Each structure stands twice: as C-alpha cells, then as structure tokens.
Amino acid sequence: MNDTFFNRMLATNAGAGALALRVPVGIIFAAHGAQKLFGWFGGYGLEGTGQFFGSVGLHPGYLMALLAGAVEFFGGLALVFGLLVRPAAAALAFAMLIAIFAVHFSQGFFLDKGGYEYALALFAASVSLLFSGGGRHSADVALAARSGGGR
C-alpha cells in the first residue's frame, strides 16, 4: 500500500467534536449490525433480515443481510475505537444510501411511518466523519504516527 495514501487516510486535525460524534454513532451502527448478524437486541438475525431484504428487492437477501450487518457491526466498532474511521465511514454512508432508497424512501420522510429521516441523519454523520476523520482522540492518530505520518 502506498504510505502517502495510508497517511492521508489516517490524517485528522479534528478535535473532540469528532469523538463526540463517532462514539455514539458507532454504538448505534454496531447495535443495528448486531441485530442483523446475531439477532441481538431484539433483532431478527441473518435469516429474518435476509428474508426482509429479499422482500424489498435486495437479492440475494441473505448475502445482503450479511453485508449490511457486517458493515454496520464492524464499521460501528471501528468508529467507536477510532480505527480506520474514513473507510468505515465511507462504507457506512454507502449502506445508509441503500437503506434510504431501497427501504425507507417510499415511506416518506418521517420515522413514525418508516421514513428515511433516521437513515438520513446516520448518513450525514457518516459523511461528516468521512471528511473530518476520527479526530485527535482516535487510534488513527497513533497509526499515522507509527507509520511516519502526522496529523
């Protein structure tokens, strides 16, 4: 891997605001991923989520559930720990775009009707972290320093 690209991906000058955003958003994503993958927190697991995904046109449903669950669970954990925040945020933003247009958009804007407002907020938070990086209080800063890059 190109060291310059790696260091640029990890570089961040963001302060505590990035920490204040990425930790709760990461917890939210990880919890939703755990629902999809493991059936934790009242989720349906891969079988139920896969059937639902298939019913809304995301085929093959099981594979799409596995991908969405993995992105949300592991991407969420990456945000919490501040590890590879930009790639995690990019994957999470993409997952939210799919959720918005494949599941929620036809239900309108408001969450009480199954709309896309919550997914849009998570998309916006992910894009913000994609731009800012994990911030000074992230594992990315330590990785960048170790590889010879700076903030």
Predicted regions mapped to residue ranges:
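Extended, low-polarity transmembrane helix blocks
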Residues: 1-40, 62-70, 74, 81-151
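Membrane-interface interhelical connector segments
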Residues: 39-60
